UniProtKB/Swiss-Prot annotation:
Species classification: Bacteria, Bacillati, Bacillota, Bacilli, Bacillales
NCBIfam families per record: PRK00364.2-2, PRK00364.2-3, PRK00364.2-4, PRK00364.2-5
GO cellular component, one term: cytoplasm
Cellular compartment(s): Cytoplasm
Described function: Together with the chaperonin GroEL, plays an essential role in assisting protein folding. The GroEL-GroES system forms a nano-cage that allows encapsulation of the non-native substrate proteins and provides a physical environment optimized to promote and accelerate protein folding. GroES binds to the apical surface of the GroEL ring, thereby capping the opening of the GroEL channel.
Protein name (database record): Co-chaperonin GroES
Keyword Cytoplasm: yes
PROSITE patterns hit by this protein: CHAPERONINS_CPN10
Length: 94
């Protein structure tokens, strides 16, 4: 399993819908890149210049919205994960 360092989080992206509401099947090139995912692992938080550790605002299992082109994709086995900085997370979906 991947363990994020610092203020990074690892997410599993939500799959984009294969069809539109009207039933049209989308090709891979027509689909928009998903910017939602579920947090799989969270780093220990950000370290300030004075040495203070700031705890992350998100936790494992949170469903989030993140910036469209943020992060680095990493493949482990048959799954693809995205490693993001916590600052790239825009919102938690409740």
């Amino acid at each position: 399993m991947l363990k994020p360092l610092g203020n990074r989080v690892i997410i599993e992206k939500k799959e984009q819908e294969q069809t539109t509401k009207s039933g049209i099947v989308l090709t891979d090139s027509a689909k928009e890149k998903s910017n939602e995912g579920v947090i799989i692992a969270v780093g220990q938080g950000r370290l300030l210049d004075n040495g203070t550790q700031v705890a992350p605002q998100v936790s494992e299992g949170d469903t989030i919205v993140f910036q469209q082109y943020a992060g680095t994709e990493v493949k482990r086995g048959d799954k693809t994960y995205l490693i993001l900085n916590e600052e790239d997370i825009l919102a938690i979906i409740e």
